[in-house]
Amino acid sequence: MMSFPIALFADVNQSFRANLVVSSYHHAITFPTVRGANFSTFFPRNFSVSADVWLCGANFSQEWQLMQPVCSTKYDSITIFITVAVVLTLITLWTILGNFFVLMALYRYGTLRTMSNCLIGNLAISDLLLAVTVLPISTVHDLLGYWVFGEFTCTLWLCMDVLYCTASIWGLCTVAFDRYLATVYPVWYHDQRSVRKAVGCIVFVWIFSIVISFAPFIGWQHMIPSFFSFNASIQRYQCILFTSSSYVLYSSMGSFVIPAILMAFMYVRIFVVLHNQSRGVKFKSGLKISSSKYNGCPVINEPSREGINGLGRDVTNTTLLSDAVGSSADLTSNGKDDPRVLATAPIELTEDVPPLNGHHHRTVHETPYVSGLHTKRSNSFALPTELEKKCKPLTNNILHMMDFDRRNSHNAVIQRSASEMVNLDVSKHELLISNVCHRSKSATALTSETGDPLGSLAGPRRSLQCNVGGLVRNKHMTLSMKRRFELREQRATKRMLLIMACFCVCWMPFLFMYILRSVCDTCHMNQHFVAAIIWLGYVNSSLNPVLYTLFNDDFKVAFKRLIGARSPSAYRSPGPRR
């Protein structure tokens, strides 16, 4: 037995020497005893008070009393005890501060209150409540190794734990669902998104979580008395996690398995869509510029469909024209300006149609391979703008289409400036052109439906006549756009993998342990191992503010402003982002 002298001050005039004794009985760390001081008035008589040590469990009353000698039955080293206490306290504080800053940013800056960010705010609420109400009690419970807060608190603590953890996991699922819709169905998402729908998702999360967490009071009332039970080996009461196999199966399916499967499916689908977008850009390198001219313009020849990386007739390549054009374009028909159309995305040219009046007429589709919806058998060229150069590409872009009547064809001119224009032979119908540069990752559509014929595309060969002042840069622009899409795909992929990896690492061990304890009564698990797995699940709530906000530039700016770090970028108001 080893003693550590500690000076304690009983009052202003007198100090006492004390010994902090590490007892070999139950390997317990006990509080110091002070010679000359009588503590028997503070504790019941059935507690043994010796001159040197309080034995953790000696003559212990089986009725819970707050004033019993508090000691740890879990650690036999003061160094390990303090280290664990510091780590658990830091996790709790970080979870509180991180999620508090997320909510403060949403409260202070109204421009952040988009549908996606409202779902992130709901996630922060569940994580914050978990950190405030559950984690402090869990810290004390895991440090001492037994329960000191009474039977009612035990039952309430277990239910609150399940409630907030379930709400947090389903909050992650709603965020994934929101991004899934925005990426895979951008047109529908742009039309249907609203704060009301976000509130509906939030209400569903909490109702479902309440049904899961408070089910013991409805269908499993017989197991409630087993939560708070006496452990004879340590002479202490314990608050035991659910062990009923039927309830464990019910809660694990609703709280972990189903949302995990949904999240995995949605993130894989998002990855596939982003990968297809990247492939779409990679394919746009096969058009060649011939030395011949048509009406004084260089001619862009299209490659054969069979010679493109074995893709057959599904997709063909594009050439990208000048990047020095303006940020918008006015569409003119019959010499009259029509400012209702803003062209900021690639336009794809599809199959030849039967010749009419000696010319080959063709249908034009605007399909920038950005929404996972791509048009087969298409050849395309792109007109990037300065606006597109400045903005970050994103996943929420819209597939739009221009259908034209072959019989009513006129000349249409997309006019960039006095010296930069592209003549297209197209015909009438409707034009839907997307804004591919919305920085908030939301889809913004500019729609124009006109009854005027838009012209027709003429030319005896598979070619495009243009007059862009010699600004055609096929190779360099294609490589630049290809690189941008590759980088965007890499960033999005890494972020999705990080989110799923953190979720699986944090919660899957708990899921296996949770199920194993219920089906195997004879399986003995080390108490330190069980506590580490439980806290690993709690850590996910401390990582969520990092994963879902610090990758968002607007949230980073808001955080800097909240803490007073006035960087130059922090002076602008955060804008909505998806």
Swiss-Prot record:
Cross-referenced PROSITE patterns: G_PROTEIN_RECEP_F1_2
UniProt keyword list: Cell membrane, Disulfide bond, G-protein coupled receptor, Glycoprotein, Membrane, Receptor, Transducer, Transmembrane, Transmembrane helix
Matching Pfam families: 7tm_1
SUPFAM superfamilies for this protein: Family A G protein-coupled receptor-like
Gene Ontology terms for molecular function: dopamine neurotransmitter receptor activity, coupled via Gi/Go; G protein-coupled receptor activity
One Gene Ontology CC term in the entry: plasma membrane
Family in the record: Belongs to the G-protein coupled receptor 1 family.
Protein name as it appears in the record: Octopamine receptor 2
Species: Lymnaea stagnalis
